[in-house]
Amino acid sequence: MTRVDVDAVFKALADPTRRRLLDSLRANSGQTLGELCRNLDMTRQAVSQHLGRLGDANLVATIRRGREKLHYLNPVPIHEIYERWIAKYQRRHLVALHALKRKVEGGRRGKA
């Protein structure tokens, strides 16, 4: 994933409406624009613009079925971000937090 791709994903995820769209697609992938509008109580134009940003970030894929355009969540960019920025640091931080928790809780027991 290039820096431009990563920046596009983070910019897309920064907007709460786009995160709600992704949540809606995660719960029920393959929705039409109309279905997404009903779930979010937004105009078609607003939802369409947000879907465009999500598509630019490769977070949403579309497939035409007849006259309908179905929108699907593409979790790959989010997984790549997880692998790059979260997974490799996760274990070390969890071990440190667990040690801190034991130390703090041990200190509380001694003072009680």
Where in the sequence are the language-model features?
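N-terminal helix-turn-helix DNA-binding core of bacterial DNA-binding proteins
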Residues: 4-43, 68-80, 84
